[in-house]
UniProtKB/Swiss-Prot annotation:
Natural source organism: Bacillus subtilis (strain 168)
The protein, known as: ADP-ribose pyrophosphatase
Residues spanning the membrane: none
Active site (record annotation): E140
Keywords linked to the UniProt accession: Hydrolase, Magnesium, Metal-binding
Annotated positions binding Mg(2+) 1: A76, E96
Protein origin, superkingdom: Bacteria
Pfam family, one: NUDIX
Amino acid sequence: MKSLEEKTIAKEQIFSGKVIDLYVEDVELPNGKASKREIVKHPGAVAVLAVTDEGKIIMVKQFRKPLERTIVEIPAGKLEKGEEPEYTALRELEEETGYTAKKLTKITAFYTSPGFADEIVHVFLAEELSVLEEKRELDEDEFVEVMEVTLEDALKLVESREVYDAKTAYAIQYLQLKEALQAQK
């Protein structure tokens, strides 16, 4: 089978930020022709599908500047240097919601936009939740409203586009499928 790989000829970092770095790469395509690739480097992130013992999903409502709107999401955040995804998942759950989890299960990991970015999101299911005695502080630039919703209401939030991001829609549909499969047993 013919190779589909591109060979990097030159690489230039054109931006280094708090969250992302941006590179422009000159590449040789599989057919021998030259092209340029703009690549966003990201440390990765986690997302937490937190479900109470009563079956409610813990979600957060927050304004997202790139979208210029407020959306509803599952708790999520960026991996800090040297952090394991499990640690980040618990940290973000605690910071954003005031809950912690005794049981944390990795559901999946996926690349958000592999055509131009290397960001990977690790998605976890958090169960056996309890409220922290002392809530951890949010980042100074973070403002969220915590919500508890049923799966049915979460699906309505997806339909109404209040849930507008892939990680949250994925997590809600995962839970819907999980519950449907359990009901068949």
